[in-house]
């Protein structure tokens, strides 16, 4: 039996705002900034603190939703996505699920086989987590994990497609199209990972488009060899 690849993409794009999603802490490059310097009781998850939403993040998200031909929801609801991990001090991530910011969009891709329509299932806002640094103790020190919360609370825009992508060429075309849209709108440089999922395979932590396409091609080849 010949199977057809079925791929849906879930993209997390860091928004180019000055402050975090739910507090006034500055958004900085966590790879160079002093650890835990840009943190307040809100993004550190202290009891009794209340979030205040970033208006500019909402405006950026609306730009993207309209550019992707989405239906903007008249009512938005934010929810708590609960999980326990050291880089998420609140014990939950503020995200959207049942009532996202926008739904039912699409983008048109120019491929070798002609134009392809990729449907956008949802566009919603959420916050990033902190960052863990692991020390293996190879130099005789005690193994440990260190937490940097500078990135905790940074605005993220999640863009989810329907499983309409069927080849590596379409995968690359969609990723390039979305990246160009976000950069043209001035809302993101798309530095965050692109995750691809569906019936085929899940790829995570791909900062580079080339890596995403290579992983997609390898997963398809593996599936075909298993089916033969």
Residue spans for each PLM region:
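Basic, nucleic-acid-interacting segments
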Residues: 1-228
